[in-house]
A protein has these predicted regions:
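RNase H-like nuclease fold core
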Residues: 3-104, 111, 115-123, 135, ...
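Intrinsically disordered, low-complexity acidic/Q/S/K-rich activation/interaction tracts characteristic
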Residues: 93-95, 117, 133, 152, ...
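Acidic, His- and aromatic-enriched active-site or binding-groove loops in soluble protein domains
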Residues: 126-137
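A polyampholytic, Gly/Pro-enriched intrinsically disordered region
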Residues: 145-165
């Protein structure tokens, strides 16, 4: 498209990415009454937070699949050192100048976001607040598992197996690494391992002639038998919330979501073996029934803010070590990841955005970065010194 005569450098690639990001973030959006905002904070190791507001119009919500990056626009992106309900309210209000008041705001229930959205809804009564389904499920899972002593013992067992099998020929049987952050949003991998290792143990017991490795593995994982009943409960719980999440990703939130789910999947729920999983399903579906009341007849609203979590993950990967200090101009890269990018749009972005605009945006939004401070310090010298090391080492 650009008739390049040589392969661009990595810095050129980065520059193009930031230019496209700047173009998408600062471009004019259509004023309409059907925008849905997806809001969340990213927290770095310092005190800075990044409030990101993504937007998608109701008319553009995809059918039969979850949102992709290309479906959404970045409405606003604001690094802040402190965040309160008042600050969030002002940020949403400022963003609404670009799009008109949103029809809905989807988020988790972080206290500052919750308060900010509540105040904005006083300003704009037609705006509704939708609680992210995955966060709600994680909260329900947390309430169940925190009271379950077996879960704590199972995690200890998993850690024991991980240590015993580490750096051995049996390392492939280790459990997945347990995450402390958002651990109740990510239980499925550990539960699946528990189910699989239980099956493996049963087969080892049935094996009459075992290899040395099989004897060792059977010994290490023997305690999985203690958790057989609990693993069955947890496995069914995971099956339940994955089924509901898949349904909601396809249908989104509608005024009859609860009824439609039962119409399609009541038979699956009836086949559940454990009362705990059945009760868990009722809790999630009761939440959906409550949420669907905000929808108008024949209206589809978004139910999930997971795309914003994914976008933050991409940013963290790009920032790498820099993410341990503060934000940089790389936050603009998120603008390059979203929206539909055609050759014409890319051409416009590269022609209309220069490095000066990016530097000015970074200075206004982020301020002087730690990276810039280090660069300045590196240039400071009391006197000009340029020694020829070869000359100094010569013997007269």
């Amino acid at each position: 498209m650009f008739n390049l005569k040589r392969t661009p450098s990595i810095n050129s690639g980065k520059s193009w990415m930031l230019k496209l990001g700047y173009y998408n973030i600062t471009k004019t959006q259509t004023i309409a009454d059907d925008w849905i905002y997806i809001i969340d904070h990213s927290i770095q190791m310092g005190k800075e937070k990044l409030l990101l507001i993504l937007g998608v119009r109701v008319k553009d919500l995809p059918r039969d699949r979850a949102l992709k990056y290309e479906d959404v626009e970045i409405i606003d992106l604001q690094p802040v050192k402190t965040s309160t309900g008042e600050v969030v309210y002002e940020q949403i209000k400022e963003a609404s100048k670009k799009t008109g008041n949103p029809r809905a705001i989807v988020s988790d229930m972080g206290s500052d976001i919750k308060l900010g959205v509540k105040k904005f809804r006083e300003f704009s009564p037609s705006t509704v607040h939708v609680y992210d389904l995955k966060h709600k499920i994680a909260l329900l899972v947390k309430k169940i598992l925190e009271k379950d002593d077996e879960w704590g013992e199972f995690k200890k067992f998993a850690n024991f197996v991980a240590k015993k099998l580490q750096n051995s020929t049996l390392a492939g049987y280790r459990p997945p690494k347990q995450k402390e952050k958002a651990r109740y949003m990510n239980i499925e991998d550990l539960v699946r391992w528990g189910d699989q290792i239980s099956i493996k143990y049963e087969r080892l017991q049935e094996t009459k002639v075992k290899t040395e490795d099989e004897i060792k593995l059977e010994s290490v994982i023997a305690d999985i038998a203690k958790f057989e009943q609990s693993v069955e409960i947890w496995t069914e719980m995971v099956m339940v919330f994955q089924l509901i999440e898949r349904f909601m990703n396809i249908h989104n939130l509608q005024r009859d979501s609860y009824e439609k789910f039962y119409e399609l999947h009541e038979g699956k729920l009836q086949k559940l073996k454990t009362e705990e999983a059945k009760g868990f399903a009722i809790q999630i579906l009761s939440f959906i029934k409550e949420q669907q009341e905000v929808c108008n007849q024949n209206e589809r609203l978004l139910h999930s803010s997971q795309i914003i979590e994914s976008l933050f993950g991409k940013l963290k990967f790009l920032e790498k070590e820099q993410s341990k200090s503060n934000f940089t101009s790389l936050v603009l890269s998120m603008g390059a990841m979203v929206s539909k990018s055609t050759p014409d749009i890319l051409k416009k972005a590269l022609e209309s955005v220069n490095v000066k605009k990016i530097k000015q945006w970074t200075k206004e939004k982020i301020g002087i970065t730690i990276q810039a401070q280090k660069k300045e310090l590196h240039k400071l010298k009391r006197v000009e010194q340029k020694w020829d090391s070869t000359e100094e080492l010569r013997v007269a």
